[in-house]
């Protein structure tokens, strides 16, 4: 029985540098006695249970994998990361849905979907960050700061249980570290994307002109409005082949 709740990394206890690359590493989530809607046994660690996400950061040096496949030695002092993964996926697969049929061995998406904070939905989302790689990864949730509740399976609290959680614009997840962060979206400007909401206010997209096409984050809309079926014969410039 686990002695305390939190977010933990499990890994091989022998030849870690090699076996980590071979996939002998993972996440272990221990629930508190308060229930599934709490990160720790603290009332102020409450979150929305349907908005709990995990981001496990890992790395791949393809030369190590080739050496293992060919049963050849590998000098770990020459280690060089070639690929960075979130939940075992590289972009654009990292934003594919949970349980995507073409990713049978990587079932978890890295794309967090959250609802607007309001009276009917008062609690934030919880993102559990785990870094099983060799370098630090600074994270920033666009649009809002994240509140760091705990690190390495321990709540941020003082000797008398006082709340020591803090907000960060960018939080750095170090190698071998876990970090529990809450995130919320307050729809101050009423950019509501729910068609059933009384505040529904999509900005329509438009067909861009090829001569005015700019490579970069130009989506044809100030925000992603309503998804449409796309244009006949359209060659998309976005990863998912969608038109908004």
Over which residues does each language-model region extend?
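Copper-binding active sites and cupredoxin-like electron-transfer domains
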Residues: 1-244
């Amino acid at each position: 029985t686990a002695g305390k709740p939190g977010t933990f990394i499990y890994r091989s206890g022998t030849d870690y540098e090699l076996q980590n690359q071979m996939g002998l590493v993972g996440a272990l989530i221990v629930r508190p006695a308060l229930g599934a809607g709490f990160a720790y046994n603290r009332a102020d660690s409450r979150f929305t249970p349907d908005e709990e996400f995990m981001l496990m950061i890992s790395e791949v040096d393809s030369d190590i994998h080739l050496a293992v496949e060919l049963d050849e030695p590998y000098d770990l002092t020459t280690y060089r990361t070639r690929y960075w993964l979130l939940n075992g996926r590289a972009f654009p697969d990292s934003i594919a849905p949970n349980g995507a049929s073409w990713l049978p061995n990587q079932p978890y998406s890295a794309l967090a979907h959250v609802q607007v904070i309001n009276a009917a939905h008062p609690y934030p989302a919880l993102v559990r960050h785990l870094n099983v790689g060799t370098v630090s990864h600074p994270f920033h949730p666009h649009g809002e700061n994240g509140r760091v509740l705990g690190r390495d399976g321990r709540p941020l609290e003082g000797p008398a249980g006082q709340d020591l959680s803090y907000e960060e614009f960018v939080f750095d997840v170090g190698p071998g570290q876990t970090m529990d962060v809450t995130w919320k979206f307050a729809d101050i400007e009423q950019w509501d994307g729910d068609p059933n909401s009384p505040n529904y206010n999509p900005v329509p997209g438009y067909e861009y002109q090829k001569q005015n096409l700019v490579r970069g984050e130009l989506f044809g809309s100030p925000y992603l409005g309503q998804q449409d079926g796309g244009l006949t014969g359209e060659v998309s410039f976005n990863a998912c082949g969608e038109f908004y």
